[in-house]
Amino acid sequence: PRRLYGEAGLIRALGELVGDDGGVLSRSPLCQSEVISLLVQLRACYHAVRRDPPQALEAILALLVPPLLTLVHGDGSLGSWQGSWAIDAADLAALVAATGVRTRPLRDVRQWGYQRVTAQKGLLLLDAAPPPLARHARTGCASTLAFEFSHAGQRIVVNCGGAACAGGLVPVRLEQGLRASAAHSTLVIDDANSTAVLINGRIGGGVSEVEIDRRTLVSEKGAGATRLEASHNGYASRYGLTHRRILILRDDGTELRGEDLLVPSGGKGKKGKVGFAIRFHLGPGIEVGLSEDGQGAGLALPDGSYWQFRSGGGQVTLEESLWVDGNGRPQPIQQLVLQGLVSRGGGNFAWLLKKMG
């Protein structure tokens, strides 16, 4: 009876921790992997004493693995979301193998809040949800509408990541900054977070609504693409503007078109113009050269490929950044920043990332 009572409590606790699509309520892939690891160890304890684990344990493992795979890049390592860092491919593969679950990544994990688009060697990940509620997360991040993009296992656009390992190789003083909107590849207004980042890992007010639309496009020539359109209200009350992001990844994976729109939301907000910055944190080892007209850049990747970034009119600058690697170590990287001023009437800012040759 004591064991049955304990098992019932475990299953109840897991039910309160995990959403209907299998994602933990912290929205953190690191937490997702930790829960999976604990359940694998628990199952091993049952086997060690020659007892059968509860059937619900296997069912929950089968529910947890597909969302985790959603946020795995082509190189097999983890994306940098909600405080997680780029956990090593070998560690992730060993964890998934230990579960015994054979499955594929989910593409549209709407309740957990992520979108995954695969296009041959190209892979796009988008955060399409508000940050987690404060009671569910230790390192909640203001990352709504941020994206990561990789091609042939090479990370091209990333988030800084690593807030959850602050205090180790990542200095504690960086934790707050790593949780900020500016530490993610998204648009930021007036250097303000889309959702308030508070001390002790908590999240305050900001984004409460996110709309997401996903569709497949086919041109007259037969070429295809996947289009994601999402918007959030995190800046509406302060600036009277809604951020809408459109991402179109061509089916061959070599061209990503983006458009960031600031749409008047009818709120009061600040008068006059405010600054905005669209940040593209670049993967490790990428060499960058700005174009002469100041509206683009060339990206030389470690694998020898060359990509071009172009803005639809705004000035592009190059700034320093950092990325937390698979060992939890901060590595120096660079970021492209498309910035300018916008009025309460809003504006739209297009950009293109394309593989050359």
Task: Cite the ranges covered by each PLM segment.
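Alpha-helical cores of eukaryotic small-GTPase signaling modules
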Residues: 1-19
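Short alpha-helical "patches" and their helix-cap loops
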Residues: 4-5, 51-60, 291-296
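Secondary-structure boundary elements
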Residues: 12, 152-154, 252
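Short, charged, low-hydrophobicity "junction" segments
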Residues: 12, 97-102, 200-202
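Carbohydrate-active enzyme catalytic cores, enriched for enzymes
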Residues: 19-158, 162, 219
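CBM-like, beta-strand-rich accessory domains located in the C-terminal region of large
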Residues: 169-357
